[in-house]
C-alpha cells in the first residue's frame, strides 16, 4: 500500500502497539507521545522490536508539563502534516484542535471510552467526593463540546461510542481502532488447547477462566473474583488467571476479599505481547470474563470470540450493544449471575463454543484488522480532501 498521507498521531496517555503498527502501514507516520507512559507501557521496546516505519517524538513532563510542551510542539510542527489523528477527546485533543484550527490542519479524534461514564466510576468507588465529581464532570463536558465543534471528524470506536460522541460532535462515525487480527486470534481444538496450556505452564485439567482486564476504576475485578469463588463452591474446579501490568494488584485484591483458598486458584502473569503472545491465552481458556462498571467497547471479548472462546461479560455500555447474542451477558455487579454463567459454560461446552464461533463470524465481518485500517485511511483521506477543497475556495474568494 502506497503511504502518501503525512499523519501525526497525537497521544496524551497510553496507546497500543497494534494500532501504531497498523497506522504506520497506511501513512507516513509520526507519533507524539508522553515519555513516561511510552516507556512504562512497554511500547517503546515493542516498537523498537517491530518493523514499523514510524518516528516517535517523546514529550516530557507530568500532566501540566505535557500540556504546555505539547502545545508548543504542535504549534511548531502541525503544518508538517496533512492531518492530525488525536487519541481521545479531552485535554490532549484540545491542544490539537485549537492549533489545527489556527493553522489549517484538520484533526480527527478517535474515542475509545466514554469520558463521562468512566469518570463517574470514580465517584461510584468513593475515590472522589461530590464536589470533585461535579467539577470534574463539568470540565469533561466543556472539553468534549469544544473539541466536538473544532474537530474535522470524531471516530467513536464501535456503535455505542459513535452514539456517545455524536452528542458533542456532529461529524461522528464509527471507527474500529486496531480491529482484530482474525488469522492470529483463531480457534483451537481440545487437543491444541491442552498443548497450549502445557506450553504456558497452566493447569491442563482445570476449567480456565481468563481475565485480561487491568485494575482500574471502571473495571469490576471484585465481581469476577467473587463469581469465580461462588462457582467453585458449586463444583466447578476452576482457576482464574489475570494477565496484565496490574496482575499483582489483582492477586492482592483476591487476598483482600478473603476468598477461600484464593492462593491456589487465582493466578497472575505480566502482560503478554499482544501481537505475538496474547492469543495463546485466549485460545487456551475455557471462558473469557470481562466485568465493568462502564465500558466503551471491550476488545478482549471480541478477541476471545475470534478464538471461538466463550465470553461472559457485564451487559454495560458497548459490551451490551456489541456482544448480544454472542456472549453470556450478566447484570452490573452481580457475582451470582456471573457464577451461573460460568457453570452454564462448563455444563454446555459444545453449545457455548458454537455461540462463540457465531461471534467469530461477526468479528470477521465487522471488526477484522484489515477492514479497520482500510476504513481509517478512507476517513483520513476524505478529511484531507475536504480541507484542501475548502482552502482552495477560500483562496479563490468563493
Regions found by a protein language model. Give the residues of each.
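Conserved acidic donor-binding segment of nucleotide-sugar-dependent glycosyltransferases
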Residues: 327-335, 344-349
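Conserved donor-binding/catalytic core segment of Leloir-type glycosyltransferases
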Residues: 203-219, 225-228, 241
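Membrane-proximal helix-turn-helix segments that form the acceptor-binding/catalytic region
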Residues: 75, 133-154
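N-terminal subdomain of nucleotide-sugar transferases
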Residues: 1-52, 398
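Short hydrophobic beta-strand element within catalytic cores of glycosyltransferases
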Residues: 310-313
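Nucleotide-activated donor-binding/catalytic signature segment of Leloir-type glycosyltransferases, i.e.
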Residues: 251-272
